[in-house]
């Protein structure tokens, strides 16, 4: 399997795509369905508003990996920009479980799932971690500009109490794919899925953009008998849904790893395999293959 580039398609009309607006929330017809979002959000909201999609390189990879009937987890689902794609790809016989701890963002996630008729999605107002607990989600001003998805949870003493669950506690009969984008807490998610990984051997897609936490995450996945590949995805593509030529994210990429069970026959072409825990993606990906 090759790492796909973002795909081109017929350009949609931006002006007619706006269906509703109330306060900071807009509803727009986007690439993977009708999406509600907060316009002040620096990355996901602005991407949906200007381009009709978010992180197209990631979406293209997910579309290639997911199949009808699969069970897929979206840990750190945010507003559901990828969740609705997951739901489409696994189909009505599949299952999607989406975690989002911020209440307002979770409400948008639920709205987006239901506006697109995805009855196969379970949206959990919770975080996933290494053990059952709870955390405090601090107040967020969603009327002001900010990267709401960058809120690193943990350590707050004040705020709304939200449960932390383990993926193992779900006792899933099958699990084929787990995406984890949880602002540096990816290792905790993996630890809480230890038995699920042993039993189901899902593909994993985990963010790894914090150098101080990278080695521990890589070692954890190596210990679980996974092969790892760097996947760097630009936030902008000229082939976006609205055909918008204005790149507001020049040089901005998301840094992730695709983890494949060692026993899997899946071949990943066009991506750098992670060879050691101390790798720095900046150095490795600057070198010729």
List where the protein language model places each region.
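Phosphate/nucleotide-binding beta-alpha loop and adjacent structural elements of enzyme active sites
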Residues: 1-289
């Amino acid at each position: 399997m090759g790492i796909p580039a973002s795909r081109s398609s017929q350009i949609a009309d931006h002006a007619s795509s706006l269906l509703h607006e109330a306060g900071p929330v807009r509803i727009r017809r986007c690439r993977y369905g009708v999406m509600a979002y907060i316009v002040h959000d620096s990355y996901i909201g602005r991407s949906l508003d200007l381009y009709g999609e978010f992180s197209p390189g990631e979406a293209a990879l997910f579309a290639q990996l997911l199949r009808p009937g699969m069970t897929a987890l979206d840990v750190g689902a945010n507003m559901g920009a990828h969740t609705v794609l997951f739901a489409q790809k696994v189909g009505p016989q599949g299952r999607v479980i989406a975690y989002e701890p911020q209440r307002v963002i979770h409400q948008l996630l639920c709205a987006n799932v239901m506006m697109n008729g995805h009855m196969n999605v379970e949206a959990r107002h919770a975080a996933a971690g290494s053990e059952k607990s709870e955390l405090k989600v601090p107040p967020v001003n969603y009327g002001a500009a900010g990267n709401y998805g960058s809120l690193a949870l943990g350590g707050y003493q004040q705020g709304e109490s939200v449960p932390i669950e383990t993926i193992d506690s779900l006792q899933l009969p099958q699990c084929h794919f787990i995406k984890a984008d949880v602002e540096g807490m990816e290792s905790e998610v993996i630890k809480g899925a230890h038995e699920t990984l042993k039993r189901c051997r899902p593909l994993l897609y985990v963010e790894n953009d914090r150098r101080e936490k990278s080695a521990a995450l890589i070692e954890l996945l190596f210990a679980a008998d996974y092969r790892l590949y760097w996947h760097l995805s630009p936030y902008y593509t000229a082939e976006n849904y609205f055909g918008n030529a204005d790149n507001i994210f020049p040089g901005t990429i998301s840094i992730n790893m695709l983890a494949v069970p060692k026993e899997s026959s899946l071949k990943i072409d066009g991506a750098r395999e992670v060879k050691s825990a101390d790798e720095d993606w900046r150095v490795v990906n600057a070198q010729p293959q």
